[in-house]
From Swiss-Prot:
Protein name per the record: Lysosomal alpha-mannosidase
An example Gene Ontology molecular-function term: metal ion binding
Pfam families for this protein: Alpha-mann_mid, Glyco_hydro38C2, Glyco_hydro_38C, Glyco_hydro_38N, Laman-like_dom
Keyword set includes ATP-binding: no
Amino acid sequence: MGAYAPAAGVSARGCLDAAGPWTISRALRPPLPPLCFFLLLLLAAPCARAGGYETCPTVQPNILNVHLVPHTHDDVGWLKTVDQYFYGIKNDIQHAGVQYILDSVISALLADPTRRFIYVEIAFFSRWWHQQTNAMREVVRDLVRQGRLEFANGGWVMNDEAATHYGAIVDQMTLGLRFLEDTFGSDGRPRVAWHIDPFGHSREQASLFAQMGFDGFFFGRLDYQDKRVRMQKLEMEQVWRASASLKPPTADLFTGVLPNGYNPPMNLCWDVLCVDQPVVEDPRSPEYNAKELVDYFLNVATAQGRHYRTNHIVMTMGSDFQYENANMWFKNLDKLIRLVNAQQAKGSSVHVLYSTPACYLWELNKANLTWSVKHDDFFPYADGPHQFWTGYFSSRPALKRYERLSYNFLQVCNQLEALVGLAANVGPYGSGDSAPLNKAMAVLQHHDAVSGTSRQHVADDYARQLAAGWVSCEVLLSNALARLRGFKDHLTFCRQLNISICPLSQTAARFQVIVYNPLGRKVNWMVRLPVSEGVFVVKDPNGRTVPSDVVIYPSSDSQAHPPELLFSASLPALGFSTYSVAQVPRWKPQARAPQPIPRRSWSPALTIENEHIRATFDPDTGLLMEIMNMNQRLLLPVRQTFFWYNASIGDNESDQASGAYIFRPNQQKPLPVSRWAQIRLVKTPLVQEVHQNFSAWCSQVVRLYPGRRHLELEWSVGPIPVGDTWGKEVISRFDTPLETKGRFYTDSNGREILERRRDYRPTWKLNQTEPVAGNYYPVNTRIYITDGKMQLTVLTDRSQGGSSLRDGSLELMVHRRLLKDDERGVSEPLMENGSGAWVRGRHLVLLDTAQAAAAGHRLLAEQEVLAPQVVLAPGGGAAYNLGAPPRTQFSGLRRELPPSVHLLTLASWGPEMLLLRLEHQFAVGEDSGRNLSAPVTLNLRDLFSTFTITRLQETTLVANQLREAASRLKWTTNTGPTPHQTPYQLDPANITLEPMEIRTFLASVQWKEVDG
């Protein structure tokens, strides 16, 4: 988005040529034979990396070198859809056509061998590449080989850092970098991460970049106060130590702040979209301005150089969708470079050159300085005193949930494709493919997609892409399940279970429920299906009857809630169980509809409880009043209810309004949606629920299942009323007496936990001008408060903004509807199709000791992100996979993974090749009671049941370099020398994972015959 505050070896090529042109493939499937792919990785040794830097231009010693970086920033959707941007459609909205930019840039690079250009968004570049002739592809390969066309970052998109989950970040980066590796070999491998537009930067993002093999990271947006301090202290560039668990330098990443965001210096923009004056060097012309521009440039360069530590500085020469007429840019830059460098003969100490981020980084590394170290992150981001970009943490909550559900579904799709092999892609249901959903999910990670900061029609298009990806994966799942089950049924994927709609379960007297568990450990999962009224019998995979309930729910004013069938499914690791459901001919409700509980001051307190938890509700208000952990004998008063902030439309202090990006409430104290809730109670052997109705547009169900150690709070909000002309930003708030000393804790992209302190920044003295918005942080999976003894943790089902604005309090923003744009470029208020959106979601609440809490929230968050997938079938289908007995239960693992180990990725990579990632999901010292923070060792040789691993190669996180061949630039820090890394060894029978470590493997496999 463009609103920025002013302020190859021959052998490798042979493999590529043998494979033919790169084609769109399924599930990261390469066009290269495995042997060629491994050869490419082996050729990518440290010498190849040095060779990449050796293509950098010559610099001048002892004077200021100004590295001009021509670039374009091409949003993968924002004001226009992805296709509209690529083809240049709807230029009345925004003049932008990516295909013309790339055409023009290649032509301009060929005109002068000194010119350089960087490109970032592989979602666009790959599409352009597929439209080129073989001759043009060779031209581009030559430019890449020469280092004149350089890829920075290399992900499918430039992902957001606040609303993204680390698994989806890794997937989208893998997709983009895989394309570059397949297409250009090591020549096209980016050496620098480049996040010039995301609105704040997470520590986990930097850790992931380091583990991907990047040498450095440059970004554009930095809090205005932080930037001022850094410029004064000469800390615009430093080393980011991005993990408290991984041993340095594993997660160390050299990080630089760009001086002008990602724009050119003022008055030096020579794009067709700009109005700055071109360089006129003919002194006879009345428009002659060369001397003035040269003097101006020298002053700008000298001033910038005062804030950086070496005799090298960088200037970004480009911006949003620029270089559609690249000649206009390059012609003026050619003149500027020649004229400025000519001044050296007159004593100037400034040298200007075409460069790239990697070449600039190379010079910084050669300076051999000692750099300061950063340990925290760059949230929240503000570009002015009342302009905190913390609203987008919660914008478009329905899209955020759809993205998270799609990540869940994609992993199920990838796993079954890997477990079954080609039979999942071509089978009785047709051609199944994981690639469309993989690419759609990659697009959704863009910093104007999952962030909720695009225009409405673009958000609709993002959802369309996800839906199309689901269809293709559903075919794949159907083929895989037919192969594994031995049945060909008409499978039904009930996509609207969140609103209790599933036609098959609501109409059929008999049906089957297949529940697939994507986790590497057994799970007990409560299945909830809408049904007709009656009595149902549920049988497990062995034909034994299991307890079940039909719960009849109260009807709200707006819609009827169908009865729901509940039963607990026992699911094997990385596998499925099949349950059969039959309606009993006689009608007898298993639970009567709950009646409203009147509010009387003398009424006893209402409780729901199981063997682990008791939740107590105030009889006068209907609000949650108290939670008790009965195992630990912990009792905590907890008052939970909903409030809303009145969104600012500007005031006397500032005309800044709340919008898609900005959160700015009119006052610090939010208003209650209601001071009490009408409540209804549901109690059956399988579930206890308190239904709370706060208003016509806000309700909640507090739910407790047998055996569970957490409360489930299922909230429903919307459409938010704005008839009073007040925009509203709705929060769920938990108030407790815990003495938290201004501290609370949030996750970073779903992985490590960061401490937050109210009205505080770790690296500068904060002038807090927005006490609410300035204390909001992104919450991807969890937030908690603790007094050191007790800990209250709330897990989310999507990314949200959250905070603790007073001791003992915790809040999460669940929905927003705004009447005014925040003037950051969208030019559209966040109204969600005008009528507003109704959104449903879940918060999972845990109360435990501070010492034991991590074991609970880590494993629960894993299960929330990768929840079981429910598929229905009418039953009685034809036999499939003749020769093998029918199967009602299956596990893809021969043994469960330990609880501290998460199977992050199992996906098809190529013919007889799989991509495997294993992760230690606990941090150092996080759990001592069960020793879950200790290193853990696995044997991969016979771990999987459907295939045998014949060869195992360990790679970097994104699988574009062999780990043994990968090397990164080394940096000296003021914290002293980093430990010497132990020599690399790989033994498939002894794979050890250290806390927070992710290990990535390419496995050559042979699939086994699927039998009983």
